[in-house]
Amino acid sequence: MSTDARANHRIKSIEIDEESLAAASRDQEQERQVAIFDLLEGNYFEPAEAGDGPYDVRLSLIENRLAFDIASAGHARRHLLSLSPFRGVIKDYFLICDSYYSAIRNSSPQQIEALDMGRRGLHNEGSNLLRERLEGKVKTDLDTARRLFTLICALHWRG
């Protein structure tokens, strides 16, 4: 894909519905802000049948489903994804993140590294699942899916 075509298929703005957003710890809020910054700095996001972007994206929860509202010039579309396939990986991700944040303050570098490897593995699992669930609706690269997965988790954090 050419650089110009790739530049047109990107998210230019991302919004998380405040009503859907769960309370977050300071660490979680920082992780969310970093994910938003990194996502907007570089991403690949190509909705099916949407034409050229860039795109404005809004994430929210609607009746226990994840809503992706995607808009660009002359295009607006909502994709709803069931949260059921994500529940296990999100639950495990939260558990290991809690352990990781605690370890940063109290554990050896080896323990922190082991938890970080587990955290990254679960993050990759969630990101790959997101790409699978979006198949036929939206194409993304792995880095974009990873950042979106972080933001999806933000909708579930229960401070």
Curated annotation (Swiss-Prot):
It holds the Pfam family UPF0262. Disulfide bonds: none annotated. It comes from the Bacteria. Belongs to the UPF0262 family. NCBIfam families: PRK02853.1. This is UPF0262 protein CCNA_02430. It comes from Caulobacter vibrioides (strain NA1000 / CB15N) (Caulobacter crescentus).
